[in-house]
Amino acid sequence: MFKIFNTKFMRSAPIVAAIWISLTAGIIIEFNRFFPDLLFHPMS
């Protein structure tokens, strides 16, 4: 089962970038769900 992660396809740049962007978006979405007003501060 872990042999699929040793292939060149899973370590290529588009796959790593898609996983990284999805993980970052998920972290931001969950942070915004639990703390809805801390992400964007008003300028006033």
UniProtKB/Swiss-Prot annotation:
> What does the UniProt keyword field contain?
Membrane, Photosynthesis, Photosystem I, Thylakoid, Transmembrane, Transmembrane helix
Keyword Cytoplasm carried by entry: no
Gene Ontology biological-process annotations: photosynthesis
Q: What is its membrane topology?
A: Single-pass membrane protein
Where is it found, in Gene Ontology cellular component terms?
Answer: photosystem I; plasma membrane-derived thylakoid membrane
The organism's place on the tree of life at top rank: Bacteria
What family name appears in the similarity comment?
Belongs to the PsaJ family.
What Pfam families is this protein classified in?
PSI_PsaJ
Q: Where are the transmembrane segments?
A: 9-29
Q: What does this protein do?
A: May help in the organization of the PsaE and PsaF subunits.
Protein name, per record: Photosystem I reaction center subunit IX
Q: Which HAMAP family match?
A: PSI_PsaJ (MF_00522)
Q: Does the keyword Cytoplasm apply?
A: no
Q: Which InterPro entries match?
A: PSI_PsaJ, PSI_PsaJ_sf
Primary location group: membrane
Q: Which PANTHER family does UniProt cross-reference here? A: PHOTOSYSTEM I REACTION CENTER SUBUNIT IX (PTHR36082:SF2), PTHR36082
Organism, scientific name: Prochlorococcus marinus (strain MIT 9515)
